[in-house]
Design a protein with these regions (language model features):
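A metal-dependent, Asp-based hydrolase signature
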Residues: 48-79
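Short, acidic loop-to-helix structural element flanking the phosphoryl-transfer center
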Residues: 73-109
Length: 148
């Protein structure tokens, strides 16, 4: 008898290849050191995670520009060119998801730290997201799942 009834997938980095590097590597002319400095000091992961927890991207961008006006153009790109950060599905993981769904042995849901403002773009781009019985999006719930 199978004791596992439910399977939970994360999305970013598991089923979907997302990275700001796809935008900023070009903007920094391949200079990884400068790009990483920008991530560590201007558009930080903590800053992005705040939007994943439901904070307005527009407000967050405006506030960040006030803090770092010299970087206005680059800050605006973070959400202004967000679609370019969203690449392809991760084939092996999607294949596994499809096999699990086809088996009809499990309830399969997704749990993701993702902004409610950008998640509809992912839904439109990735048809496999319709395979889930439910998707819990941190930005819709106004909280994030912990990383530690």
């Amino acid at each position: 008898m199978n004791k596992i009834k439910n399977i939970i997938f994360d999305l970013g980095g598991v089923l979907i290849d997302w990275s700001p590097d796809y935008v900023y590597l070009k903007e920094f002319n391949g200079n990884i050191e400068k790009m990483n400095w920008f991530y560590e000091n201007i558009c930080t992961m903590d800053w992005n995670e705040n939007q994943d927890a439901g904070y307005s991207m527009k407000k967050a961008t405006e506030e960040r520009i006030k803090m770092f006006p010299k970087y206005k153009k680059l800050i605006k790109m973070y959400y202004g060119r967000w679609d370019e950060m969203l690449k392809d599905s991760i084939k092996g993981s999607v294949d596994l998801l499809e096999r699990l769904v086809e088996s009809k042995k499990y309830k399969i849901i997704a749990l993701t730290n993702w902004s409610a403002e950008t998640f509809p773009k992912a839904l439109n781009k990735f048809e496999f997201l319709n395979l889930f019985e439910g998707i819990v999006v941190s930005g819709e719930e106004k909280t994030r799942k912990p990383f530690k």
